[in-house]
């Protein structure tokens, strides 16, 4: 009988498989198992599992360990990789501010500066091995809480309206040995925007000013973020402040010592001329641009506090406004005869304006000038035989050129 493949055999029953068919099925099954087994063996010889699914040989180590407390702010943070190279290291403080770092040799990351004290940091790092397989690590830690601290005492105050000559001046309660790090935590901006630069005087004072006097109406903002900043070894800042102040109208007064008079110019127009008495022989008034830093309706002036011994001690000097740290004021004077003003320089270096004792008479020149002056107004003195006042003697920053101011030297 001729049998074609796939055709039924004539006369054969279809109720079940034949004996020969069963044997054939068993043989085919055995062959399939053998082929499958051989195929599996060949796969192993060819490399087995996909290399991309193998774990990375690179390892990432973050120091300090996750959850660490009281971590030092300098030298403690390191991220390293063995059997691989670092491809990403991200460190942020609890405000989301990034920490700048540097990778050495592809396997060691360290911050370029010091961390802040009493601050929580988050670290995320990734490394790859020679097959570019990634390994990642995450950690958080908190830096130490300092025992020794400092703050900056600033002027002007928040919300104050001041004159066009007012700098931002910050005096620190401790001497600063890392001024660059501290200055990074302080920002002064203005609207409308102008270039503003800071300059240090000694190790405990930092002032900011624009190139020229502020324009009237300018809004100035001071942001201080010194929390955890190490200003000197083992001494950390604790301060976060946001203040703003406004520049009022422009008023610049000029005292001509030779002429013994003061011209008051507001918004470019002379509004008043006032006779004065300035420093006499041997106690001349400084020349230069001086900024009103304090106002006192009545104050005591004692010569012993400024090196004049017992030459004077006046308990009730009216309408006094400070122009220097060393003791220069522009103030009311009731003890000299009225004829002195405009005719003779007889003070110990201050600028005197005629006034009444107690300062109750609002019609006197001293009362008028006091009522019409702001902290931050400029009083310029010229034609005196004394030297120009130093920029750090008071808020008198305008006695330094912009080029020198910006140079920091």
What are these regions (language model features)?
Residues 164, 303-409:
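Exported/periplasmic cell-wall-interacting domains
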Residues 234-342:
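Gly/Pro-biased beta-strand-loop elements
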Residues 61, 78-80, 122, 169-171, ...:
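Soluble periplasmic/extracytoplasmic beta-strand elements of cell-envelope proteins
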Residues 127-129, 226-228, 268, 298, ...:
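Short, charged beta-turn/beta-strand-edge "cap" motif at the junction between a beta-strand
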Residues 2-35, 39-249, 276:
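Acidic, low-complexity Ser/Thr/Gly/Pro-rich repeat segments typical of extracellular/periplasmic
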Residues 155, 251-259, 399-409:
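Short peripheral tails and domain-boundary helices/loops at the edges of structured domains
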């Amino acid at each position: 009988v001729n049998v074609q493949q796939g055709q039924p055999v004539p006369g054969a029953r279809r109720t079940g498989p034949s004996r020969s068919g069963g044997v054939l099925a068993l043989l085919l099954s055995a062959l399939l198992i053998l082929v499958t087994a051989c195929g599996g063996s060949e796969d192993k010889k060819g490399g087995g599992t996909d290399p991309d699914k193998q774990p990375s040989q690179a390892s990432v180590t973050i120091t300090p360990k996750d959850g660490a407390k009281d971590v030092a702010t300098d030298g403690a943070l390191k991220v390293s990789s063995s059997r691989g190279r670092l491809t990403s290291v991200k460190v942020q403080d609890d405000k989301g501010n990034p920490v700048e770092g540097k990778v050495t040799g592809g396997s060691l990351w360290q911050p370029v500066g010091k961390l802040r004290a009493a601050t929580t940091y988050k670290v995320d790092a990734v490394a790859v091995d020679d097959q570019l397989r990634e390994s990642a690590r995450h950690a958080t830690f908190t830096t130490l809480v300092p025992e020794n601290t400092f703050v900056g005492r600033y002027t002007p105050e928040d919300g104050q309206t001041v004159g066009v000559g007012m700098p931002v001046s910050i005096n620190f309660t401790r001497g600063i040995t890392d001024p660059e790090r501290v200055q990074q935590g302080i920002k002064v901006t203005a609207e409308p925007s102008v270039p503003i630069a800071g300059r240090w005087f000694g190790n405990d004072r930092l002032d900011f000013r624009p190139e020229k006097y502020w324009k009237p109406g300018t809004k100035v903002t001071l942001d201080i973020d010194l929390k955890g900043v190490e200003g000197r070894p083992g001494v950390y800042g604790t301060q976060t402040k946001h203040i703003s102040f406004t520049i009022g109208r422009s008023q610049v007064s000029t005292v001509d010592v030779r002429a013994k008079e003061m011209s008051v110019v507001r918004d470019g127009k002379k509004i008043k001329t006032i006779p004065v008495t300035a420093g006499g022989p041997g106690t001349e008034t400084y020349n230069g641009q001086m900024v009103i830093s304090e106002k006192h309706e009545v104050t005591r002036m004692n010569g012993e506090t400024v090196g004049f011994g017992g030459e004077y001690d006046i308990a009730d000097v009216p309408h006094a406004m400070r122009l220097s740290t060393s003791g220069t004021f522009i103030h009311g004077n009731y003890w000299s005869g009225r004829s002195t003003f405009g005719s003779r320089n007889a003070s110990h270096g201050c600028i005197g304006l005629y006034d009444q004792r107690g300062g109750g008479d609002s019609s006197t020149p001293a009362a008028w000038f006091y009522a019409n002056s702001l902290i931050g107004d400029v009083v310029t003195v010229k034609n005196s035989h004394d030297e120009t006042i130093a920029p750090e003697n008071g808020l008198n920053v305008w006695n330094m050129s912009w080029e020198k101011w910006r140079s920091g030297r």
